[in-house]
Amino acid sequence: MLDFDLVLFGATGDLAMRKLFVSLYEIYIHYGFKNDSRIIASGRKELSNEEFLALLCEKTQLHSREKGEEFLTHISYLRVRLDNPKDFEELSKIATNNKPLIFYFSISPSFFATTAQNLAQNALNHANTRLILEKPLGHDLKTCKEIFQSISAFFKEEQIFRIDHYLGKKGVQNILELRLNNPILNILWDQISAVEICVYETLGVEERGEFYDKIGALRDMVQNHLLQVLSLIATDLPNDLKDLRQEKIKVLKTLQPPKDFTKQVIRAQYQGYRDENKVHKESQTETFVAIKAFLDTPKFKGVPFYLKHAKKMPRNQASVKIHFNAVNTLEFFLSQDKITLTLKDHQNPLILETHNKQEFLQPYAKLLYDAIPNNHYNFAHQLELEASWVFIDTLIEGFINNATPLYSYESHNLNESEFLKPLYQ
């Protein structure tokens, strides 16, 4: 039975209604809550408990699920306007300091500093306090640092959990689990000749046109998700997982800026993107990006890491393919609970299929569950973000200076092998 209090800022928002309450329910079903564990839903709207729960049930149908009514008894609503110190005084009256107290910032980063300050001024930054921060955590290195500085004035790094739901995916978790539990793979890890990390989507920007047009594929997917996967592959495994983030920082700091943009970076935009709702008619935002990246480490010097992400592709794909010397390959499927592992050598082909039959929490539930006992290794450290932004900023500067052209591709009909030929030559 879990014992904690969680305050969810932005409780009436889209993410909370689609993902967060359902994830908390999933944790409740698997592990249970102690009777006095509370979820305090917070928003700007003036709602009674009954009105909020009615809204929540309308959006999620939680009341009709197994033990749903029991779960809902742990939820109450408190109006908190993030720029109103008096509302935080009311919050401090019902918050506790004798068990984990988690504040989930499902709010715009523009409110992070004010919210952190109001929490601290009401003695809500004690040793048991944790902050879970939602992306985007910056638009570049400068703004990433500014966000951290505004929060670190009141909270320590070890109190901050930067959530990247990709790190909670079973397929991504499998990378670490396989490396930890299969010594033979660690021998093969010294023989890697190339790595391909690919996330393709058949969908376009849908209703996110205004938001997406300001960030593009590079910031939306590569800066966080794909570079986090890269770091899990390239890091030296520590003896204690508590040290994993420090090892990932070392890896990300060795990312090399492109020497030749035309041979290492391809960007493109799907035809019709500029006609999407709230997208600028002359937009230069990329919806396709492919990068041939290199690390300056003894083990991976000269080994290409191909990072690929695109929208409006012919198929959905989320995978990592690791190529070894002597034509061995290893492939992870990031969006599935299945691991298909194909190891080949010239004489003894071997196909292994591992199906994990154990129940596994969905990504947000997995990460929320990790935050309760203060497990950080599935959350990014500030220095990981800064190292990734240093690399991403060099690419953004190249885009601004047209170091690589913005190509166009037909929706759902891109010839990938032809399009990516410059990267693989």
From Swiss-Prot:
Family: Belongs to the glucose-6-phosphate dehydrogenase family.
Gene Ontology terms: biological process: glucose metabolic process; pentose-phosphate shunt, oxidative branch
Transmembrane domains' residue ranges: none
Cited SUPFAM superfamilies: Glyceraldehyde-3-phosphate dehydrogenase-like, C-terminal domain, NAD(P)-binding Rossmann-fold domains
EC id: 1.1.1.49
UniProt name for this protein: Glucose-6-phosphate 1-dehydrogenase
Binding site residues for substrate: 165, 169, 201, 220, 311
Gene Ontology MF terms in the entry: glucose-6-phosphate dehydrogenase activity; NADP binding
Keywords: Carbohydrate metabolism, Glucose metabolism, NADP, Oxidoreductase
Function comment: Catalyzes the oxidation of glucose 6-phosphate to 6-phosphogluconolactone.
Gene Ontology CC entries for this record: cytosol
Reactions catalysed, as given in the entry: D-glucose 6-phosphate + NADP(+) = 6-phospho-D-glucono-1,5-lactone + NADPH + H(+)
Residues that coordinate or bind NADP(+): 44, 135
Primary enzyme class: oxidoreductase
Pathway per the UniProt entry: Carbohydrate degradation; pentose phosphate pathway; D-ribulose 5-phosphate from D-glucose 6-phosphate (oxidative stage): step 1/3
Active site as annotated: 225
